Amino acid sequence: MSESQSELDKYGTNLTKTAATNKLDPVIGRDAEIRRVCQILSRRTKNNPVLIGSAGVGKTAIVEGLAQRIVAGDVPESLRNKEIVSLDLSALLAGASYRGEFEKRVKNLLEEIQKSKVIIFIDEVHTLMSAGAAEGAIAAGNMLKPLLARGELRLIGATTLDEYREHLEKDPALERRFQQVFVGEPNLEDCIAIMRGLKERYEAHHKVSISDTALVTAVELSSRYITGRQLPDKAIDLLDEAASSLRMEIDSSPVELDQLRREVDRLRLEELALKSENDPTSEQRLRSITNQLSGKQEMLNTLQASWNSERARLNQIGALKEQIDIAKQSADIAQREGRLEDASRLLYATIPQLQKNLAEKLEEQDSAPLVSDQVMPEDIASVVEGWTGIPVKKLMQKDAKQLLHLEEDLSKSVIAQKVAIGVIADAVRRSRAGLSDPNRPSGTFLFLGPTGVGKTQLVKALASLLYDGEIVRIDMSEYSEKFSISRLIGAPPGYIGHESAGQLTESVRRRPYSVVLFDEAEKAHPEVFDILLQVLDEGRLTDSHGRTVDFRNTIIVLTSNIGSRYLSDISLEATTAHEYVNDEVRRTFRPEFLNRLDEIVIFEPLSQSDICQIVDLNIESLNKRIKDRRIVVTVSEDLRRWLSKSGYDVIYGARPLRRLIQREIEDRLAKLIIEGLIHDGQTASFDLSGGAVNAQVCS
């Protein structure tokens, strides 16, 4: 018996013993699932529940909750004094190198389980199907079937929906011996209750306090922004990482102290260097440095003393919280074991005294502490931003100011398209203020207009300003064939390339906060737009692997040249031209597609005065490219007017101007640099003389 018991201890973990020492996290809710598991375990035959649900919904927690109820005696009579042992199949397999050794281990283990009447829990129960099944050996699942059928072995399994379908359903003989218990994702209210139940454990572990608003924020933000994972797992992860980050900040130096220490070190180095100099300027500088160093050192000493005192107080608070948590666990164990005297001493003497000491320490807090010891919603938002790249933190003053002046900033890069700029800016402000529909993309637009008027440039400018340059560009001319749709979402199963991800879905899955640009939309096959209907309406798209990709934090822009000939026709009035363009759009795209767009924006052709401003933009862009060489390019007013006149074309927009500047200015500048006629720090001045462009180098 002792030898067999050692086998059970070797390959399993006793969850009831762990629960008896209060080492398991409290399980909040899930009463219906735990009751259903108890009902199945109380059956005469086929008393083997299998918990089925997505990863992270709390299947293992239900078994831990059952173990806690067994310890507390809150179970039916048939389950009282039972033990739940979590079996580790990998430990059972490890080292079984000889044929028959694995089967012998399983047989000995099963005999011991039958004698001791423990309940076995196997996480990832689908691994039973393949465990040990090599070179003609019998799989563990086949060895368990007779015992499971007779009810001589009580087994709780846990697996995901996909693994259950893929492994257990393929073996009907094994599947019928299990009773399914579906575990769904908890709703937001239940998840918040779960988080509140776990709050004290995480406070004691990280030695910080967690505000209730942070718990609610963790649930709400994880539900909205973190896709592909389930509650409550993702919300708990958010809270854990935010608390860990705060603890690390407390254990290290505050930013103010660190900056001041670096400043003092820099001044000391400069002081040492100046002591070896004898000239009057150096001596004067040395006196100034010495005075600065004296003042900074005094500030550093004061701040360091304040921080040492504050850190000691925070550590004492953390230690008191940990002691309270341990005392509460000890009181629970004492009550359960009938040691009422010990329990009353802990509950009515030790714990109240510790709580009183904690309250006194909390009152000692400074009005302006160097670092906070409380996890706030902003800390949760910072973690979400780190995971997803989505700026979900509350709008700072700098961000708000930038959003209010977004039109001005965009107008610096895109000339003369005020309507389009206004529409885009309004969509961004709605999204950042939290007013846009949470189940749709931040904005969906169709940009129409002649070539070279700034359709793509506006998208690039927006991405540069607000999205850190994150732009997913899909060139629709590459999707002119019907079968090319598979490149967007991935090839279907059985086709070459199924393992490769879709060009669109994978880009957005990796960067959910970005601008998605479908360039030259009219060149794509009409059926390509069918897959965009779900994106435009619901903000989601399922790829070829069945993964749902979230588009709710993207701005989607389609550009097209449809009807541009009407806009370039100077004989037509603007309203008439717009009507012709809209008619052609309706003929090209299906009504259900157009009806899902937020706005159809028509870009106007550029005028002569607009081209003059674009000349300045191009010269400014050139100066940025050669900034490292410290060379500056200037253009005379005559040359500026000549460039705008010669580079103006109502049909081709601003692109001919770019080619003209490249030919007349950039090519000449390149020759000057290569010939060594212009050096770093000099200015290249371009002007017009006798109808030809001349370059002059100035110091």
From Swiss-Prot:
Report the SUPFAM superfamilies cross-referenced here: P-loop containing nucleoside triphosphate hydrolases
Chain intervals for the UniProt region annotation (C-terminal): 606-699
Signal sequence, start to end: none
Q: Which residues form a coiled coil?
A: 236-367
Q: Which CDD domains match?
A: AAA, RecA-like_ClpB_Hsp104-like
This protein's record includes keyword Coiled coil? yes
Q: Which SMART domains match?
A: AAA, ClpB_D2-small
User: Which family, according to UniProt?
Assistant: Belongs to the ClpA/ClpB family.
PANTHER family the UniProt entry points to: ATP-DEPENDENT CLP PROTEASE, HEAT SHOCK PROTEIN 104
How are the domains described in the entry?
The N-terminal domain probably functions as a substrate-discriminating domain, recruiting aggregated proteins to the ClpB hexamer and/or stabilizing bound proteins. The NBD2 domain is responsible for oligomerization, whereas the NBD1 domain stabilizes the hexamer probably in an ATP-dependent manner. The movement of the coiled-coil domain is essential for ClpB ability to rescue proteins from an aggregated state, probably by pulling apart large aggregated proteins, which are bound between the coiled-coils motifs of adjacent ClpB subunits in the functional hexamer.
- Name by which UniProt lists this protein: Chaperone protein ClpB
Q: Which organism is it from?
A: Tropheryma whipplei (strain TW08/27)
Q: Which gene encodes it?
A: clpB
